[in-house]
């Protein structure tokens, strides 16, 4: 029934103290999993299935501290990071690569965190990697700032991020028009 569906959706938007605690717990345990990923990166380098070394480190924390992984972990190194929702996790991890990890732990209450990070395999970004990483981080921060404004719609959050990305692409000479032109309805 449509009315029930709408009411349930509204209820899901508001969290009580218990739900907030569980969401925070899911994030804390997921963060611990990411910390273990960082610790195993040196072992993953050169391993024929280094992506699985990364996935396994996260899965161990998820199983020990929660119900397990809340969804299939993406551990995509190098060119695999270009494949949307890469879950094979069967590739090598090479020095100089970036590894994209999207993972979350499901805690006992069934709440699941969802964290995505791009990590430099050797612990340091190249100059170009750092510039791109900073642009994405700035876009994320702009989106979060917009999300915290009263009356904000999802589209407003998306637009805030896209404004930053368009500006950076223009600064770097990649965007052939102004950011305003690219973001206008005609530029879409």
Task: Specify the residue positions occupied by each region the protein language model found.
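Active-site neighborhoods and metal-handling regions in enzymes and metal-associated proteins
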Residues: 1-188
């Amino acid at each position: 029934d449509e009315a029930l569906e709408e009411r349930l959706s509204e209820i899901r938007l508001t969290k009580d103290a218990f739900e907030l605690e569980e969401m925070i717990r899911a994030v804390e345990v997921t963060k611990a999993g990411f910390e273990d990923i960082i610790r195993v990166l040196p072992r993953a380098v050169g391993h024929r299935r280094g992506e699985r070394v990364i996935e396994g480190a996260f899965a161990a924390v998820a199983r020990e501290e929660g119900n397990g992984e809340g969804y299939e972990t993406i551990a995509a190194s190098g060119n695999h990071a270009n494949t949307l929702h890469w879950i094979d996790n069967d590739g090598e991890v090479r020095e100089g690569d970036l590894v994209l990890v999207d993972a979350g732990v499901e805690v006992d209450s069934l709440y699941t965190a969802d964290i995505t990070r791009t990590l430099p395999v050797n612990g340091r970004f190249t100059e170009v990697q750092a510039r791109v990483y900073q642009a994405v981080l700035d876009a994320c921060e702009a989106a979060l700032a917009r999300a915290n404004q009263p009356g904000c719609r999802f589209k407003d959050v998306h637009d805030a991020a896209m404004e930053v990305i368009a500006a950076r692409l223009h600064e770097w000479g990649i965007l052939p028009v102004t950011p305003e032109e690219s973001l206008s309805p005609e530029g879409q």
